[in-house]
From Swiss-Prot:
Official protein name in the record: Antimicrobial peptide ISAMP
Cellular compartment(s): Secreted
GO cellular component: extracellular region
GO biological process: defense response to bacterium
Job description of the protein: Has antimicrobial activity against B.cereus (MIC=5.8 ug/ml), B.subtilis (MIC=12.3 ug/ml), S.aureus (MIC=10.4 ug/ml), E.coli Edl 933 (MIC=3.2 ug/ml) and E.coli MG/655 (MIC=4.2 ug/ml). Non-hemolytic.
Tissue expression: Expressed in the fat body, hemocytes and salivary glands of partially-fed female ticks. Not expressed in the midgut.
Alphabetic keyword roster: Antibiotic, Antimicrobial, Secreted, Signal
Primary subcellular site in the record, as a coarse category: secreted
Signal peptide: 1-23
Superkingdom of origin organism: Eukaryota
Length: 69
């Protein structure tokens, strides 16, 4: 009887872990509009090259990727 109880508890624990580790459902399309402005893909070396749209500076610092921001 003890073995059956341990087996059932183990199955319940595994099911809880599976539920917690599963990925959430994707959001509605109207919620997934987080995107970067088109000027983020413009390569640059100086701030003057990035006066386009909402971008105003060049991300050319030590850890920068040399694109407009």
């Amino acid at each position: 009887m003890r073995a059956v109880a341990i087996f059932i508890v183990t199955l319940l624990v595994l099911e809880c872990v599976y539920f917690v580790m599963s990925e959430p459902d994707p959001g509605q399309p109207w919620q997934v509009k987080a995107g970067r402005p088109p000027c983020y893909s413009i390569p640059c070396r100086k701030h003057d090259e990035c006066r386009v749209g909402s971008c105003s500076r060049c991300n050319n610092g030590l850890w920068g990727d040399r694109t407009c921001r």
